[in-house]
């Protein structure tokens, strides 16, 4: 399946900004079952400096700088991406979560996809005892890693409320957990925080959600949305599997 993606991001400042530096991570990348045929960024106003590169994990980065007053910044993304349907992995075909934890801490793999990079707290995801206790209920002794992650995903979908505006980009996992509401970013952070508290590698992924319209319904531009989900490491044989703990209303 080939998708044409268009995204427009607009920043409005309270007062003109004379100097600004930004780091953009908006360009899709090639990965398993995904190939980028074309991608372009259009930035208004035109930056005085623009550099392209990639980070340690392979994400494409654009650095931009401005030296003239401006009160609005607009970034437009256009991309054509080919996506192949991945072969589904049954939860019962993955190892027990305790074995995955042992394998993660024993791994000496230094590559960007290694589990060691996704075991510990970060600036965005703290480890919280209340979240750990909540997540522990999904991981009784001997349950397979993907069965536990799927159970946790379904519990969050059932017990938390998807509400735009209830949180912000700076909301921490303990804050959204206490609220029991938020958006896909918040629910993904809760899932990551809790599973990492158990010693399980989980990564954060952002991308796009394609909605499915009813038969005869016209697809409206803007009906689809940016999305975030968790990648769960299921051991060295199975690798990384995605789980979305978000109740979307689009």
Q: What are these model-derived regions, one by one?
A:
Residues 28-37, 108-110, 157-160, 185-189, ...:
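Short low-complexity stretches enriched in small and charged residues
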Residues 85-88, 164, 195, 199-202:
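Long, hydrophobic, amphipathic alpha-helical segments used as structural scaffolds
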Residues 1-4, 33-42, 163-165, 189-194, ...:
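A broad, low-specificity signal for short, low-complexity segments enriched in glycine/proline
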């Amino acid at each position: 399946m080939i998708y044409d993606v268009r995204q427009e991001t607009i920043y409005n400042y309270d007062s003109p900004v004379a100097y600004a530096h930004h780091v953009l991570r908006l360009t899709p990348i090639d990965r398993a079952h995904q190939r980028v045929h074309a991608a372009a960024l259009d930035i208004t106003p035109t930056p005085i400096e623009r550099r392209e590169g990639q980070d340690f994990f392979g994400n494409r980065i654009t650095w931009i700088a401005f030296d003239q007053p401006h009160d609005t910044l607009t970034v437009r993304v256009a991309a054509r991406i080919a996506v192949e349907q991945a072969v589904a992995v049954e939860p019962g075909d993955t190892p027990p979560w305790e074995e995955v934890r042992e394998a993660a801490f024993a791994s000496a793999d230094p590559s960007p996809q290694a589990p060691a990079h996704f075991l510990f707290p970060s600036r965005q995801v703290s480890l919280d005892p209340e979240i750990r206790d909540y997540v522990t209920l999904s991981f009784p002794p001997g349950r397979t890693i993907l069965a536990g992650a799927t159970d946790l995903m379904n519990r969050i979908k059932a017990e938390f409320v998807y509400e735009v505006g209830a949180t912000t980009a700076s909301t921490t996992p303990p804050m959204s957990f206490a609220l029991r509401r938020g958006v896909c970013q918040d629910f993904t952070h809760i899932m990551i925080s809790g599973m990492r508290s158990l010693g399980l590698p989980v990564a954060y992924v952002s991308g796009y959600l394609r909605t499915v319209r009813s038969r005869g319904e016209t697809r409206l531009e803007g009906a689809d949305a940016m999305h975030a989900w968790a990648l769960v490491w299921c051991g060295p044989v199975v690798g990384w599997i995605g789980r979305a703990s978000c109740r979307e209303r689009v």
